[in-house]
Amino acid sequence: MSASTSSHRPIKGILKNKSSSGSSVATSGQQSGGTIQDVKRKKSQKWDESSILAAHRATYRDYDLMKANEPGTSYMSVQDNGEDSVRDVEGEDSVRGVEGKEATDASDHSCEVDEQESSEAYMRKILLHKQEKKRQFEMRRRLHYNEELNIKLARQLMWKELQSEDNENEETPQGTNEEKTAAEESEEAPLTGGLQTQSCDP
């Protein structure tokens, strides 16, 4: 039976082995009263950090050890009212500029004003670019939804055209080919012109 217990390895847990920490506690416990040290040992736990990492984190999961060395980016959200947001940005920048001007010397004043003007111009440029992108997106979205309506109208017009051709074929089955082609050309011209004007409307 001793052979089976010696070949059987104990399961490695998160906590430190009792034998490694228990032996040091036992020797000190024998010196200064074993009951006090046993109580402290029962109340406190010592964690084996390497066992925790090995048990709960695979080797390929080192994403929590990576560090970002990039500086934070300044982001300004665009509000619904484009003109109001431009005014708000100008107001905030001017307030920040006034506080900065009071804190600096007269020699630094000219450098700071240049930097502030360039940063204000840059922020305005970014804001205008974002507003332009938003406007273009909304225009494309409107055109996309109008495209569905245009397709429905085109289907209705095609259906009406087919119905009118069927009615004409039933009424005059013996008509000449020249009359049909002239009639079809006159009908097609207004229909295609109508589709073109409808697709251009926003």
UniProtKB/Swiss-Prot annotation:
Family: Belongs to the protein phosphatase inhibitor 2 family.
Key word Glycosyltransferase present: no
Entry-linked PANTHER family: PROTEIN PHOSPHATASE INHIBITOR, PROTEIN PHOSPHATASE INHIBITOR 2 FAMILY MEMBER C
Low complexity bias (residue ranges): 19-35
Record bears the keyword Iron-sulfur: no
A Pfam family of this chain: IPP-2
Tissue expression: Detected in sperm (at protein level).
Gene Ontology MF terms in the entry: protein phosphatase inhibitor activity
Positions of the UniProt region annotated as Disordered: 1-51, 71-118, 162-202
Required for binding PPP1CC, as annotated region: 12-17, 43-55
GO biological process: intracellular signal transduction; regulation of signal transduction
Name the record gives this protein: Protein phosphatase inhibitor 2 family member C
InterPro entries per record: PPI-2
